[in-house]
């Protein structure tokens, strides 16, 4: 009984546990760093005017120019989607404590754009600003085909789990057997990278650094063990 207790303590301290006699459970993690090949940005036009119709008209005109510019830059129509249309009253408040009154109207037209050639991103940002874009609500870098990188991370996670199992089995003086169960945990996809507000300028090309994305995977494996 003393030997069995020592085995359980050893394995527990190492991050694994014997689920039942003849079985050992381990977890493995894998990560792959990859350069993103796509950017997803949300941009828009906002305009304020005394008349609601004027606000909508001006915003629509600028949005139309931006859509035409994106088309001219080679952005496919399937990669451009209107994500928000809004019209709100702008209230003016008085120091006397009187109720606020409508002073103007603000119209906003926002689109989400996928840029499949990251090298064009700086040019796209600069050109749409020139055409009237005055709102940038986010920039995320992504992968067009993440599956192969996810599979690489999974293979690394499985290898990590097996290496742990072999180590624990050797340390405990038992023989590692076949895989009895394997399950995938919550992997972590590429994290979005925020765009700095300072990038909103009408230069020839806005400098943007894509960096790297990390694709992660996690597995839990159950092995048989024998004396």
Predicted segments — roles?
Residues 2-5, 14-227:
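Short, charge-dense linear interaction motifs
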């Amino acid at each position: 009984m003393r030997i069995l207790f020592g085995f359980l303590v050893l394995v527990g301290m190492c991050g694994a546990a014997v689920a039942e006699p003849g079985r050992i459970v381990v977890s493995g993690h894998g990560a792959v760093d990859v350069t993103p090949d796509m950017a997803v940005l949300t941009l828009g036009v906002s305009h304020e005017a005394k008349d609601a119709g004027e606000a909508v008209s001006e915003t629509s005109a600028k949005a139309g120019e931006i859509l035409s510019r994106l088309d001219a830059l080679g952005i496919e129509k399937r990669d451009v989607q209107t994500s928000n249309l809004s019209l709100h009253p702008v209230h003016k408040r008085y120091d006397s404590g009187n109720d606020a009154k409508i002073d103007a109207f603000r119209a906003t037209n926002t689109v989400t754009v996928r840029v499949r050639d990251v090298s064009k991103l700086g040019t796209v940002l600069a050109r749409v600003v020139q055409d009237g874009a005055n709102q940038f609500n986010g920039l995320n870098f992504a992968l067009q085909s993440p599956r192969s990188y996810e599979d690489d991370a999974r293979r690394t996670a499985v290898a990590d789990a097996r290496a742990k199992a072999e180590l624990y089995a050797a340390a405990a003086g038992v023989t590692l057997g076949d895989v009895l169960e394997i399950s995938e945990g919550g992997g972590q996809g590429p994290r979005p990278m925020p765009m700095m507000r300072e990038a909103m300028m009408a230069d020839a090309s806005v400098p943007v650094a894509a960096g790297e994305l990390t694709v992660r995977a996690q597995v839990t494996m159950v092995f048989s063990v024998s004396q």
